[in-house]
Amino acid sequence: MMAFEQIPKKDWYSILGADPSASVSDLKQKYQKLILMYHPDKQSADAPAGSVEECIQKFIEIDQAWKILGNEETKKEYDLQRHEDDLRNMGPVDARIYLEEMSWNEDDHSFSLSCRCGGKYSVSKDEAEEVTLISCDTCSLIIELLHYC
């Protein structure tokens, strides 16, 4: 599935000091500024050993953050995983639905399902393959999207 499942959960955006809505060029600027600041070659030779090790660890984290957020594909996967984690933290799954049970909307190329509150669950065709949790656009209910094997 996603490469992020093996990596301990880290907020790569906060490591770069960026907002999740930041553009790739903004992320790159923050990365470049931080990577220079924490680069091992830029550290003072007379700095305490613990301080140097902390800088090296921070340098590695900044580099990892950029490798994930600087690549369009891995950034998309990471953002989807963050979104699903946020939904999981909102509460339990209300129902498990197969994609085939949802209605296809040709106008906006999305699948949708009515919620018991009158709102709807919707997911684009592209997202349908990747997301597993969908929130109602009106209330706090969440469904789990299942796929036939």
Curated annotation (Swiss-Prot):
Q: DPH-type MB domain spans which residues? A: 93-148
Q: Which InterPro entries does UniProt cross-reference here?
A: DnaJ_domain, DPH_MB_dom, DPH_MB_sf, J_dom_sf
* Entry-linked Gene3D superfamilies: DnaJ domain (1.10.287.110), DPH Zinc finger (3.10.660.10)
Binding site residues for Zn(2+): 115, 117, 136, 139
Domain J, which positions?
A: 11-82
Per UniProt, the keywords (alphabetical) are: Cytoplasm, Cytoskeleton, Electron transport, Iron, Metal-binding, Transport, Zinc
Q: What Gene Ontology cellular-component terms does the record carry? A: cytoplasm; cytoskeleton
Pathway(s) of this molecule: Protein modification; peptidyl-diphthamide biosynthesis
- Show the domain comment: The DPH-type metal-binding (MB) domain can bind either zinc or iron ions.
The family note in this entry says: Belongs to the DPH4 family.
Q: What is this protein called?
A: DnaJ homolog subfamily C member 24
